[in-house]
């Protein structure tokens, strides 16, 4: 970790960010940049093709010990429902390597494959690449706290796997040169 990397611990949570909601798309896998790239490309292309008077929804994104929630604050006159994802439903979080202002996460929507693809990629456009990085580190702190609680709990439970990619976009790009979808 470089000197410029944000240091965020569970004691810093909750953290709230004002970002734009890029949207959600099906993801083909549980974790890994290879499962967020195509959904992000699709959502960015769709956003670029929006009519001039249409903007992406502005949301208040909050990361706490229990997970992530966001609520649309674009039109303050309309009360929007908060969308929540518990930490055990989030399998992956990453700052995009191409669009460095984009933070994406993979959500496990269903534990079975009976209903098609059980994973969704949700993406947010941040004010800066540093903000996208802070969101990634905040989610990492949330994951660490969840792991600590599971260990302390000591009960038998189904093991849920999750990952957070803390590499910089440059490090991700260097590592992905040999990565394929096969």
Model-found features: residue ranges?
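Non-catalytic membrane-recruitment/adaptor modules and adjacent regulatory linkers
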Residues: 1-182
């Amino acid at each position: 970790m470089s000197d410029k990397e944000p240091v965020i611990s569970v004691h810093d949570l909750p953290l709230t960010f004002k970002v734009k909601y890029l949207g959600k798309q099906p993801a083909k896998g549980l974790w890994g940049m290879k499962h967020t790239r195509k959904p992000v490309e699709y959502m960015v292309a769709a956003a670029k093709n929006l009519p001039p008077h249409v903007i992406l929804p502005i949301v208040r994104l909050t990361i706490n010990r229990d997970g992530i929630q966001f609520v649309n604050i674009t039109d303050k006159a309309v009360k929007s429902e908060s969308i929540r994802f518990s930490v055990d439903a989030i399998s992956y979080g990453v700052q995009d390597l191409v669009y460095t202002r984009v933070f994406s996460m993979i959500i496990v929507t269903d534990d079975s494959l009976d209903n098609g693809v059980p994973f969704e990629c949700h993406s947010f456009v941040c004010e800066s690449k540093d903000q996208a990085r802070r969101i990634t580190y905040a989610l990492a702190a949330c994951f660490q706290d969840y792991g600590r609680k599971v260990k302390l709990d000591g009960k038998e439970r189904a093991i849920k796997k999750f990952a957070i990619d803390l590499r910089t976009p440059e490090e991700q790009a260097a590592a992905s040169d040999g990565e394929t979808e096969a």
